Amino acid sequence: MTTSSSSPLSYKDAGVDIDAGDALVERIKPLAKKTMREGVLAGIGGFGALFEVPKRYKEPVLVSGTDGVGTKLRLAFEWNMHDTVGIDLVAMSVNDVLVQGAEPLFFLDYFACGKLDVDTAAAVVGGIAKGCELSGCALIGGETAEMPGMYPEGEYDLAGFAVGAVEKSKILTGKEVQPGDVVLGLASSGVHSNGFSLVRKCIERAGADRPATLDGKPFKQALMEPTRLYVKNVLAALAAHPIKALAHITGGGLLENIPRVLPEGTAAHLKKGSWPQTELFAWLQKTAGIDDFEMNRTFNNGIGMVVVVDAANAQATAKTLRDAGEQVYEIGVIAPRGEGAAVIVG
């Protein structure tokens, strides 16, 4: 036979602090306000956010993307570095939307935890707002889920959702890519948000022998450097040049992501050494003891976005991107595929 206490139980007693949630919303509102842009009719606070597609689009096609930050979050927990993973969250989705030729319009986030720490959550959302601001998209809504017993104390998970628009006639499909086209690579800012399960093993293996700095940055900062946001610079290049295809280099690296935008019967031949390997990736490769093939299939290995253009437009496109602030390398050409792999590095 069981007995129950006569004391009343509140939602807070059960582990859900509504007041903390309300306090977080008040912290978020001014951050979200800074991201507002044309098209926002109603943002944070309502049951649903409202967005009107800008009238300058004649035949708008909506493009959606969703992603997370993966096990990079484990380092954020261990090192108490929460202010940049929100940028990662935005970048993973808006860069994906971008490769269709689309302009990101708005973003929503999902933050889940076992016990809500308002300061930690506000730091994360501050990063999300910064990522949206840098991408020109509005943070118009989100969900904060406090779920006692679902996550260890001090841990959380993130998911992001982006929607963009592109003129129907300007959707990038890669179907016009052909042999002779040039492959440009835009430098990454670091590991970005993929491969961190292996990164964490490398940190564990290195122990106290890990370097103090990598590429001029403190070790932890180098690894937590947020995913580069390519949106504004690449949109400017798209407006000025006939770009044929874009590929966001995420999980699977160069070897798995470039083929996603290549027509059947074509392959990308990348020239080894045509872009520099940073200290960060050299350290990861040496510590893990893996070959070049595995590096290019696990990490972005220094190239975060690939741009495919006609050879006649390659120099002008590269100049536009460089002038905007990108590090651009001519890393290869498109060739007939034959019997080989879709991406060959050699």
Curated annotation (Swiss-Prot):
Pathway: Purine metabolism; IMP biosynthesis via de novo pathway; 5-amino-1-(5-phospho-D-ribosyl)imidazole from N(2)-formyl-N(1)-(5-phospho-D-ribosyl)glycinamide: step 2/2. Its EC number is 6.3.3.1. It is an enzyme of class 6 (ligase). InterPro entries: PurM-like_C_dom, PurM-like_C_sf, PurM-like_N, PurM-like_N_sf, PurM_cligase. NCBIfam families: purM. GO terms for biological process: 'de novo' IMP biosynthetic process; adenine biosynthetic process. It is found in: Cytoplasm. Pfam families: AIRS, AIRS_C. This is Phosphoribosylformylglycinamidine cyclo-ligase. HAMAP family: AIRS. One of its GO terms (molecular function) is phosphoribosylamine-glycine ligase activity.
